[in-house]
Amino acid sequence: MTQNWRPQSRLQTMTFAGTARPMTSMTAAGFTKNPLATAGVASIFDKLPPEPPKDSPEQKADQMEINIFKLLRDGMSAASCKDYVTALGRIREAIKLEQKVSQHRTMNGLADSINLDLRTCIWMHWAQIQALGGQPEMALSTYEKIVKTAEGATLAQIRFNMGNINHNLGKYNEALKNFRMAIDQASPSLPRFRQKIASHMAQSCIKLHRWQDAVDRIEEYLIKQYTLASSVGTDVERQNFYAMTTRFDPLYTVLIGYYALGVPEKMIDAYSRLIDSSILISDHPDSLEIDDHHNGISSKQIAMADAELCNMSNDDELDDLSRYNATLRHEHTNKLLISARLLAPAIAWEESQGYAKLSDILREKGHHGISLQVQMSMALTLLKRNEFEKATDIMLRIDREGLESALALGINVPLSILQKTRNLSLTAAATAVTNQESDLHLLGIDPSVLANQQSVVDRDAVASRGAPEVDMLKTDDDNGTKKQPYAAFVPRGVHTNIAFIYYLKGDYEASARHAQIALEIDPYDSFAHINLGCTYSKTNQWELSLREFLKAQEINMESVQATYNAGLVYFKQQEYKTAYSCFQKVASKLPSYGDAIYMSADCLARMSQIDEAIQMLSNLVTMFSAVKAYDPSIYIRLGELYSIAGDEGQAAHYFKEAHRLVPFSLAVINWLGSHYIKNELYEQARVCFEKASRVDTTTPKWSLAVAACLRKSKQYRDAIYEYKHILKRFPTNTTAMTHLISSLNNIGQHKEADEWAEKLTKLTNNKVPEVTEDRELDEFVKQERRNSVAAVGPGSRAGQDRFEASNNRVSSNTGDLFGDVDIAEELLTEN
């Protein structure tokens, strides 16, 4: 009977040589240092193999290669600092050291281990630094030498570099040839590199004005990438392949190509594909909310992401990777908006219809916030065309849609915003009020108390509108220092632009209201502060205006508008030193901004620093003359300052220059006429006053000055004719009648003089009021004068204000450098 087989009870992993075999110990158990030695067997781990010699040929070669890599690193570091001489020196040392390594390996029988890839790498660095250092031809010759031994990805990289050099040299056909060779050698496992090659091929085709070829190259590349992605086996590998493929930039180039070809259907299709390939989902923690029912990103996350993109919020709280993602999203959003501005006039007969189409595409794809930004671009386009009403309607619609989206997502919008906008639909507003009242009940607050308080505020607001001057005080909100959640749904600048439009219309109450809404939505909007400050200045609330300008400066230290406007307020308050500092800051940032330099000189003049003011204005004249631009107001102010300094010759020179540019300026004519009279040049003075009489026909002042010049030059008969002409138009002018009598007596016509003296006596005894206006003046002339005054708007501040300032003479009072006494009238008055 055979015995059944059973497995062994021990593994028998320990074997012994000889006759020794494991036995049960008959002594006490203890630690044995070397159990095998007791059995007469030596362990194979007792001794290590002998250490190789330290100065072996392999170790020397390896150390020399390490030194080569150090030289390469130092050379490229120097090249990054644009120190190309040092970089070439390091690479030259690396080349020599590599030659020594090759000789060392050959002499020691190690020729098979020569590192050819290292040699190619060194020469590629050498050629790259030559190209960066302005030696493209030498770089090409270097690449031609190493391209013969290169293969695979290295060969593709060399051909790509050669194509870039030829492209920069303007050899676009050669560049295309090298790019084609590069893309043939590039492995399909390098999708980003292949994409870069295809993009550069398209750029070369664009330079050759071969737009269709450029589009075909990119479209062909995209089709190949889609085919490769579809051929990948698993979903994970397919997703990884898509992640390695950047489709946005190629599609952006395709869109521009179709725009150049003028194919509207292709433009719209490319824009739709560009939206699909863009990265527009935010990774901000507050906006991440996964919808469990749909296994994807919720609509609230998309809305929050689009809102964040539209407002371009600060990314300081993000880590480096998230900041890079945010930067990429911002770049994609900006390019989408630029594409919309580019395509809108080309895809429809009217530009507004093009914007509407693109906005609808964005809205259909779920990007509501960016569609509002596109509508904002349409509104800005209408503003450039001076279609203010249409632009205002569009921006109000944008505001309504943004706030309604916020309310639909359950985001709390304060009642103050809802009441100030007056722009929401009744359903959305009622829903918002109901939700907020329920929140108040949960907090134990009676909504009726707040409603009563609000009704009092409304009554006060209605009463204030009836006042002659609106007191638009801005109440500081406790939440004014932080951006509110609902602010992300209103594109930045909507209410700021609306406030600006109402400011131009002269509706300062509406302008202030929208500026305040803009600040409640975004307290860090410097332009809203500037608009509000300008509105306050129009209602003579200078302290409030200055406060807003200073806030705008705190938010944006580079805001020249806020600094300049603050300087104007300081100038109005006669704080000339502070105003001068503000204007100088603007001039330092914008050296060619003439208004800042002019106002700086004006501040110096007000501080009695006449020489410095003259020097500054002279520099301004030189700067304008270099570009053949001339401002008569600068010449006028220079003439006034030279007159204050006592240099009448220079003053007359600059007033003549101003008169050459603006011959209709009565202020300039008045000064020149008075200057000629003081120097007894009555004929030149008469010519000036005759020009003034043709400009201003509503007063006999200038005709009297002409007649007085004739009397001063002893031309009594011509003076008599002029006085009679004046009395035909102004029969009750006693001044003309008195001088007429005097002139008649001077030429011996006493009888006629007595007749005029009798008329003067009757006129004086009857106390008939003197008529200073021309009775025959046509109503058309008055209307033309009113139109000419109305045509001078806020944009003409430089010319208008300076003419008004120069309309007066200098008085003896040092506090007011420009008085209000007529120089010519004083000089021509007879004792």
Swiss-Prot record:
Disulphide connectivity of cysteines: none
First-listed, main subcellular location of the protein, grouped into a coarse class: other
Gene3D superfamilies given in the database record: Tetratricopeptide repeat domain (1.25.40.10)
One Pfam short name: TPR_8
Record's subcellular location: Cell projection, Cilium, Flagellum; Cytoplasm, Cytoskeleton, Flagellum axoneme; Cytoplasm, Cytoskeleton, Flagellum basal body
Region annotated Disordered, chain positions: 785-816
Coiled-coil segments: none
UniProt cross-references to PROSITE patterns, sorted A to Z: TPR (PS50005)
GO biological process, one term: cilium assembly
Gene Ontology MF term list: kinesin binding
Keywords noted in UniProt: Cell projection, Cilium, Cilium biogenesis/degradation, Cytoplasm, Cytoskeleton, Flagellum, Repeat, TPR repeat
Transcription regulation found in the keyword field: no
UniProt TPR repeat ranges: 68-101, 120-153, 156-189, 248-281, 492-525, 526-559, 560-593, 595-627, 632-665, 666-699, 700-733
Biological function: Component of the intraflagellar transport complex B (IFT-B) involved in flagellar assembly.
Protein name: Intraflagellar transport protein 88
Natural source organism: Giardia intestinalis (strain ATCC 50803 / WB clone C6)
